[in-house]
Structure formats: C-alpha cells, structure tokens
Amino acid sequence: MAGHSQFANIKHRKGAQDAKRAQRFTKLIREIIVSAKQGLPDPEFNSRLRSAIIAAKKENLPKDRIDAAIKSATGNTQSDNYEEVVYEGYGPGNIALMIQTLTNNRNRTAAELRHALSKYNGKLGESGSVSFLFNHVGVIAYKAASIDNFDSLFNIAIELQALDVEETTQDESQEKMYYVTCNVQDFGNVRDQLFNKFSDAEFSRLFWKPSDILKIEDEEIQKKISSLMDLLENNDDVQYIDSNFTFC
C-alpha cells in the first residue's frame, strides 16, 4: 500500500506499548470480563471472548488468571462492572484521538484523561467533536507470513461483505500485515468465518480508522505526542487509542 497507512498507529498491545507487564494483564483481564458478560462465558459460543482469550495467550497471561476472569464475569462483583466508554480529544499538533476505555467509574476516567491531555496542550472534547474524522469499522489482522494465499483471504473476505483487504508494513517492525476491514455490524460474522478458514488472527477489534492522515514533522511536537501517548496508554482504564497522525 503506497503512502502513509491508515493502520500505521493501530495498537494491538505489544510489549513496547505497555511499560508494565502487570498493567498489560490488567487490561487483558478487563476485556475478558466484559466479553464474557456480553455473551455466554464460553469462547466456543462467544467470538469476542474467544478473541480476548487469544490476545491474552499471546501476551502469556496465565491460564488460571484467564479462567478466574471468566468466572468473575458470572458473579456480581461491583468492581468488575466495567462499561465501554469512548472519549474524544485533541492532542499536540491538533491530532485527533479516539480513546477506548473499560471503566467502572466514568467520572474518574474522564478527569484523568482531561488532565493528561491538558498537560500536553490538548483537550477532551464532547461526543462527536472528533469522531467525524474517523470511520468506525471492524478490523481483523493477519501476519502475511501466516497466510499461504492472499487471493484466498481476499476472495473470502469480499464474499463476507468485507469493505476492504489491505496489505501494509508495520512502521516499527517492517513486518508485512493484511488488514481486513468490515462494517461494525458484520464484525462478529466476518471474524468467525475467517477464524474457521484461517484460524487465529494476529488481532481483531473495533477500530476508529482515520479518514485522512495528519503528517507531523516538527520534532518538538513529535516529542509531546509521544509523551502524551505514553501517559494515556499507562492509564489502566485505557484499552486502545486510535489516532490520525504519522511522524515524518
């Protein structure tokens, strides 16, 4: 894919994106709990839970902790009553941010995000103030090396009414990836059908895909953005941050 990829900054929880192992585990456990609560607590019949477990295993979350998270989802523990909240904001250089969280206290999370953004000359926006710059889609990503035949992936994805199949290279690792995008309402079915055909994806999730990419050339602004992203990603409530920038 030529030019700057719209997937350049998609986060799928590699070690470099979360400073502490324990913090990564906290985020993975929250996703498992929420996924199990939204459907049957059995990954065979709950595709979102299956994806959450796959992600947890990739991060070496111990099986007993995965099982405990699923079990806790069937209880009524108040501290485990997480809800999915998306916050919108702007950062240095007027970059747009869609911050996906799992929180049990909206007010606390909003206050912490507002403080982090303001520290780097950004601001937390109202609903709709940033989202118009993005398209909300489902993404299923495969390492190119794990797919024997790209045409097969492409044809099956299109048959499933996927919006697109893109080939791109990760900026940091230079690893070639295939990204299947689909409408949000088709996400579960597309993910399940691709799983049946090609087994585990590298990751799959709902993604705020930027309509356009903002190129940041100023080194000082780049440093501020990097510091802000680190601060946001170190917040336990933050699961993903989708953005519309790339560094030049």
From Swiss-Prot:
Region Disordered, residue ranges: 1-21
Cell compartments where the protein resides: Cytoplasm
Gene3D superfamilies reported for this sequence: 1.10.10.200, 3.30.70.980
Keyword field: Cytoplasm, DNA-binding, Transcription, Transcription regulation
Taxonomy, superkingdom: Bacteria
GO molecular function: DNA binding
Pfam families recorded: TACO1_YebC_N, Transcrip_reg
One Gene Ontology term, aspect cellular component: cytoplasm
UniProt GO BP: regulation of DNA-templated transcription
Principal subcellular localization: cytoplasm
Transmembrane segments: none
Family statement: Belongs to the TACO1 family.
Protein name: Probable transcriptional regulatory protein Ecaj_0351
Organism: Ehrlichia canis (strain Jake)
